[in-house]
């Protein structure tokens, strides 16, 4: 079978009039659509069956031929071909225009392509095309210039003076004549000469013209094709007309627009035949031009054509643009069959890989499978009776459904799908009711809760799709978060609380110091009330089934609690017995202090020891990560299920509740508030005496109240009983934190007003005491602003993710090793003295570029190109090594992607990244998904200049869009020493003395200096506080410095908010922003100066001329913001579906661009498999080979080694 979708590239260009005629099946001559009485299409009209094909399958217009046997017959009465009705989706017609008409995209776009080709201004073009002025097309032997504009009056005067020696005309015909006269080769040569001398604006104009002319010359498009002689008419099914219930018709706007064109065209033909006066003809031509403009892009010029109710009509361009356009609505996202959605409820008894599917939904989703099975089992004679059985829901259907559903995973998706964990696969189990049951542990990944959330179900149909869902998407496989490689399935809320309660210790609990021969005996004692879960007891170590105990330890007693015995039973045997929440206990073994000799006085030893802290959420997360590291996926998911069950069971048994009596108001609160008030009064006194400024007074008042709140918070936390239910909830990490507590029992503290400025009157009451009316009113500001911000933030963050995905969607792991000799030198990221991201975090899962040696002993810690694991990273960090040279995406040489070595470990699996992994999209999701957690606006802590640097989401946008930052820092362009800091008028100037020259920098008013005289400074370093503009930095330094700066800044924003993201994700994005260069001098290559080129294209062009011994081109690297970078991509399909659709398509058509279909988006658009993952060619060409016994033996050996 021929594969329709197997084409290599897609090309777009201008259509010549002949090409348009060759597409067409006939000319549309009349504006009629459908006859209102017979409801049949009118002949030669917009829905004509003769042109576009029959309305009913195998039936001509007049009914002479019906049935499939006349296939291909053309009816002799009505001229309709007997064929399928769906040809009405593909057959085009055309309109022969009575006068040439300009295409608005090429005339009106920015820059005007027609204007660039003719070297005329868009204003002049508009005057000619819309019949306001004449243009000289042939000057003859008159003093007139070609392309000179003449008004009506001037034209008449010249006609009288020179007669017919010159030619001038109006409208698109005149422009067409000029376009036909142009000699591309001559113009291009002339412009290339001009470029050698031209400067400033003339140079930019010349570069733009050269680009367009070269495009026409290389693509084989004729410039005159920008003027239309023939207008194509799209197939009628794409602009349908449907009858509504009231007998009225609803029609697509395009039909109205086509009707206006046909009416005006026919009227113009008639006027020309009649030989009407030129002024009438001109007016009609202008109206035809406007009608065609409206059809192609309504509203681009002048007022849009409106339909009933003053609604602008949707033209052809609008059909492509925006979220509702063809690209984003129908090509990039389609609605699919075999899907359903319902409300979710919790399924606490499900296994990690299961979900509960409502019976009726499952029956509908798996209908075809059930039908096939019914027929195969002989329960139904044919498909039709099987279908009837299902529709009547007969009892035998359910048994068949059960068997069909086994081993057939389904996909569950929750919107918004912010990262790849928003769609996971589960094995369905049938449940009663109409709600989908979801495993509680996957809620974190979906960000789901059960307050009415809904989820969608999709069924993978083919066996390949099922296999992929099972192997790659099963919930039990997705334990780690792709953004940081930490477990994403940590228990939350009840589960945390239950495990916390289970591992509590309590001094003097019932039965303290009892000794048991094994865990069962201890449990028996607990069930009969002799001991409590929290009782500290001793158990014979030999009876605790743990492989990490030494022989000596096994002969001793283990001090623990009954709860911890229960808790440790969920862990694998070879895992240490966890008795205290410390890393050494987790990673190595149970500390020796918990083992005592048999016969020792157990009660005394226990009584002399402090209580050990219970296991909070963080510890549970560490346990999961450690288990995952040692035992891989299956064991981890089993352990998670056991942990979940324990948590639910014991949070139920604990019966932890919250009552008003649990909130005890602090006694010393009034005293602290009095002290603070006295300090505030003192500050106000100082201000009134003029000792301090208004700003200082404000800042001091704010800090006094903040400190008072902190003191209250500290004392409150100390005074709390460790058994206080609210404390237990917050301490375990189940719900709430210290600040909630302070607000309940201490004081609410300072609030911000709607503009973000902090109100200096604090709220002194707590919720327990109750607020005054004024305090309540002040509180509402903050609450309302919080809600408004959240709504805005979600939209902003979603748009950021969309732009990130778009710029990185074609970054795929393409090869094993690119063989680069460059690397990235990394150290810990610091802000002042605070470490934002440690060297350890940056090293794990990367390949070393150069050998790392111990600074003192010289011993090799990491060899070149070796993977740095957690253990190696610890050793490197502890050895005192400050910087390491690693392989990085920044320095990778792979085209259209990265290689395995430069990318390093895949964070989502903890193993090497596979060739075909779509790392670009994963990077975009990892950066975009936490976007909603970042704060929105800058907080103003009073008007201290320089402190208002942007943070949170706006800062991330600023970085990725490469905008000039707010509060920009001045940077030094040279290496040198700060020679002096001078005061000039009301500003300061910094003089930097280099080896050769001195530079003077004016410091903006209000900026704070970072340097002092005599200090050494290197180029690209800041002289003042603030953010550096990356574009400036690129001018002064090199690409590496800019890459490192952007990486550091992004990490700063996220880490400050407590969000961890792997460096490699940011690296992938930043690399995409720096992949273009701007050609400054073309040398002897055929690239054009001033154009943006991909680095690889540029090096290829240079390599070609260097081999011939010619002069290579030179270029500067360019930093593009992500929006700009997406639009500059080589793929026009990807760019057009992103933003500015018409501009991208206009440009691509003129250049005759080829889309090589390398990225993911382009392939989704044309309906091919994406070239990533199993869609890559190297995986598609796999053949099945019969295995022999020898192969089996080899494979078994390999498997054995891996264990």
UniProtKB/Swiss-Prot annotation:
This protein's GO cellular component annotations are:
DNA-directed RNA polymerase complex
| EC number(s) per entry | 2.7.7.6
Q: What are the entry keywords?
A: DNA-directed RNA polymerase, Magnesium, Metal-binding, Nucleotidyltransferase, Transcription, Transferase, Zinc
Give the cofactor note: Binds 1 Mg(2+) ion per subunit.
> Which residues are involved in binding Mg(2+)?
449, 451, 453
Q: What class of enzyme is it?
A: transferase
Alphabetical list of Gene3D superfamilies matching this protein: 1.10.132.30, 1.10.150.390, 1.10.1790.20, 1.10.40.90, 2.40.40.20, 2.40.50.100, RNA polymerase II, clamp domain (4.10.860.120), RNA polymerase Rpb1, domain 3 (1.10.274.100)
- Cofactors named for this entry: Mg(2+); Zn(2+)
Instruction: Cite the binding residues for Zn(2+) 1.
Output: 60, 62, 75, 78
Kindly list the positions annotated as binding Zn(2+) 2: 818, 892, 899, 902
MF (Gene Ontology)? DNA binding; DNA-directed RNA polymerase activity; magnesium ion binding; zinc ion binding
GO process terms (BP):
DNA-templated transcription
- Coiled coil (residue ranges): none
Q: Catalyses which reaction? A: RNA(n) + a ribonucleoside 5'-triphosphate = RNA(n+1) + diphosphate
Q: Name one Pfam family in it.
A: RNA_pol_Rpb1_3
What family is reported?
Belongs to the RNA polymerase beta' chain family.
The function of this protein is: DNA-dependent RNA polymerase catalyzes the transcription of DNA into RNA using the four ribonucleoside triphosphates as substrates.
Whom does it interact with, and what assembly results?
The RNAP catalytic core consists of 2 alpha, 1 beta, 1 beta' and 1 omega subunit. When a sigma factor is associated with the core the holoenzyme is formed, which can initiate transcription.
Q: Give the protein name, as stated in the record.
A: DNA-directed RNA polymerase subunit beta'
Gene it is expressed from: rpoC
């Amino acid at each position: 079978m021929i594969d329709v979708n197997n084409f290599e590239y897609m090309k777009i260009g201008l259509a010549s009039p002949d090409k348009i005629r060759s597409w067409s099946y006939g000319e549309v001559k009349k504006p009629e659509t459908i006859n209102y009485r017979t409801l049949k299409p009118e002949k030669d009209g917009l829905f004509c069956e003769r042109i576009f094909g029959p309305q009913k399958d195998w039936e001509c217009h007049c009914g002479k031929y019906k049935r499939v046997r006349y296939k291909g017959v053309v009816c002799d009465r009505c001229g309709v071909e007997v064929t399928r009705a769906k040809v009405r989706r593909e057959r085009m017609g055309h309109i022969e225009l009575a006068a040439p008409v300009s295409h608005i995209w090429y005339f009106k776009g920015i820059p005007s392509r027609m204007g660039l080709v003719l070297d005329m201004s868009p204003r002049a073009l508009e005057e000619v095309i819309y019949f306001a002025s004449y243009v000289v097309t042939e000057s003859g032997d008159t003093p007139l210039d070609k392309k000179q504009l003449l008004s009506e009056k001037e034209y008449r005067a010249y006609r009288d003076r020179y007669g017919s020696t010159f030619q001038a005309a109006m409208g698109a015909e005149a422009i067409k004549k000029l376009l036909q006269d142009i000699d591309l080769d001559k113009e291009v040569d002339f412009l290339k000469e001009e470029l050698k001398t031209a400067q400033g604006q003339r140079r930019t104009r010349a570069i733009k013209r050269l680009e367009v002319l070269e495009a026409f010359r290389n693509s084989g498009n004729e410039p005159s094709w920008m003027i239309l002689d023939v207008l194509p008419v799209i197939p009628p099914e794409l602009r349908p007309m449907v009858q509504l219930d009231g007998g009225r018709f609803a029609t697509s706007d395009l039909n109205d627009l086509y009707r206006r064109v046909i009416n005006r065209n026919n009227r113009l033909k008639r006027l020309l035949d009649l030989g009407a006066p030129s002024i009438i003809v001109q007016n009609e031509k202008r109206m035809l031009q406007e009608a065609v403009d409206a059809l192609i892009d309504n509203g681009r010029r002048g007022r849009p054509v409106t339909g009933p109710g003053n609604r602008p009509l949707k033209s052809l361009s609008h059909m492509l643009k925006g979220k509702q356009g063809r690209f984003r609505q129908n090509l990039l996202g389609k609605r699919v069959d075999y899907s359903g959605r319902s409300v979710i409820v919790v399924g606490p008894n499900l296994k990690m890989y299961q979900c509960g599917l409502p019976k009726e939904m499952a029956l509908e989703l798996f209908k075809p499978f059930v039908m096939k099975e019914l027929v195969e089992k002989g329960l139904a004679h044919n498909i039709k009776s099987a279908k009837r059985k299902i529709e009547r829901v007969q009892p035998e259907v359910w048994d068949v459904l059960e068997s069909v559903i086994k081993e057939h995973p389904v996909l569950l998706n929750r919107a918004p799908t912010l990262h790849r964990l928003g769609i996971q696969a589960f094995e369905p189990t049938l449940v009663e009711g109409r709600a989908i049951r979801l495993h509680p542990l996957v809620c974190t990944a979906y960000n789901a809760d059960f307050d009415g959330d809904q989820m969608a179900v999709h069924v993978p149909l083919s066996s390949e799709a099922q296999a992929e869902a099972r192997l790659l998407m099963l919930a039990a496989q997705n334990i780690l978060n792709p953004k940081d490689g930490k477990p994403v399935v940590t228990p939350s809320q009840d589960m945390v609380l239950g495990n916390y309660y289970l591992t509590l210790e309590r001094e003097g609990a019932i039965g303290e110091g009892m000794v048991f021969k094994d865990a069962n005996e201890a449990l028996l004692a607990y069930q009969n009330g002799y001991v409590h879960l929290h009782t500290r007891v001793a158990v014979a170590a030999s009876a605790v089934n743990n492989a990490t105990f030494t022989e000596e330890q096994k002969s001793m007693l283990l001090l623990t609690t009954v709860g911890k015995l229960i808790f440790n039973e969920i862990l694998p045997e070879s895992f240490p017995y966890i008795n205290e929440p410390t890393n050494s206990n987790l990673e190595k073994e149970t500390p020796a202090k918990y083992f005592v000799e048999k016969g020792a006085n157990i009660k005394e030893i226990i009584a002399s020891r402090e209580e050990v802290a219970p296991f909070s959420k963080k510890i549970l997360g560490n346990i999961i990560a450690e288990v995952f590291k040692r035992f891989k996926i299956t064991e981890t998911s089993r352990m998670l299920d056991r942990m979940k069950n324990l948590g639910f069971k014991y949070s139920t048994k604990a019966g932890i509740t919250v009552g008003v009596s649990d909130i005890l108001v602090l006694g010393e609160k009034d005293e602290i508030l009095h002290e603070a008030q006295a300090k505030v009064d003192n500050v106000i006194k100082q201000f009134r005496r003029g000792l301090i400024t208004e700003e200082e007074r404000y800042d001091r008042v704010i800090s006094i109240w903040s400190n008072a709140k902190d003191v209250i918070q500290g004392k409150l936390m100390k005074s709390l009983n460790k058994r206080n239910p609210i404390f237990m909830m917050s301490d375990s990490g189940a719900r709430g934190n210290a600040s909630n507590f302070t607000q309940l029992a201490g004081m609410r503290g300072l609030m911000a007003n709607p503009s973000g400025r902090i109100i200096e009157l604090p709220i002194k009451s707590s919720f327990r005491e109750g607020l005054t009316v004024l305090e309540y009113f002040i509180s509402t500001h903050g609450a309302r602003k919080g809600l408004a911000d959240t709504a805005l933030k979600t939209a902003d963050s979603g748009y950021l993710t969309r732009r990130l995905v778009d710029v990185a969607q074609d970054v795929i792991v393409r090869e094993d090793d690119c063989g680069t000799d460059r690397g990235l030198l990394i150290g810990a990221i610091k802000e002042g003295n605070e470490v934002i991201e440690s060297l350890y975090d940056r090293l794990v899962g990367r390949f070393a570029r150069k050998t790392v040696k111990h600074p003192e002993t010289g011993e090799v810690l990491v060899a070149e190109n070796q993977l740095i694991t957690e253990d190696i990273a610890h050793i490197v960090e502890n050895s005192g090594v400050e910087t390491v040279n690693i392989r990085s995406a920044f320095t990778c040489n792979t085209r259209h992607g990265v290689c395995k070595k430069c990318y390093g470990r895949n964070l989502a699996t903890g193993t090497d990244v596979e060739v075909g992994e779509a790392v670009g999209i994963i990077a975009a999701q990892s950066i975009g998904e936490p976007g909603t957690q970042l704060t929105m606006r800058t907080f103003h802590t009073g008007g201290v200049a320089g402190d208002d640097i942007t943070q949170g989401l706006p800062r991330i946008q600023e970085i990725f869009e490469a905008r000039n930052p707010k509060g920009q820092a001045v940077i030094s362009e040279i290496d040198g020493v700060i020679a002096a800091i001078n005061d000039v008028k009301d500003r300061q100037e910094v003089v930097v003395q280099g080896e050769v020259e001195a530079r003077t920098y004016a410091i903006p008013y209000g900026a704070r200096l970072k340097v002092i005289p005599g200090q050494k400074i290197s180029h690209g370093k800041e002289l003042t506080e603030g953010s550096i503009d990356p574009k400036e930095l690129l001018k002064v330094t090199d690409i590496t410095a800019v890459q490192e700066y952007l990486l550091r800044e992004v990490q700063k924003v996220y880490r400050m908010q407590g969000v961890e993201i792997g460096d490699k994700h940011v690296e992938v994005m930043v690399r995409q922003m720096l992949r273009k260069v701007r050609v400054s001098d073309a040398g002897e290559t055929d690239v054009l100066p001033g154009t943006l080129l991909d680095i690889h294209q540029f090096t290829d062009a240079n390599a070609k001329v260097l081999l011939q011994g010619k002069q290579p081109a030179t270029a500067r690297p360019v930093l593009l913001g992500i929006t700009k970078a997406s639009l500059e991509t080589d793929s026009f399909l990807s760019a057009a579906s992103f933003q500015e659709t018409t501009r991208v398509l206009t440009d691509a058509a003129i250049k005759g661009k080829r889309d090589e279909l390398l990225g993911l988006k382009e392939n989704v658009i044309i309906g091919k498999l994406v070239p990533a993952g199993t869609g890559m060619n190297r995986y598609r060409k796999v053949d099945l080979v019969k295995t022999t016994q020898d192969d089996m033996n080899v494979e078994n050996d390999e498997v054995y080694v891996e264990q």
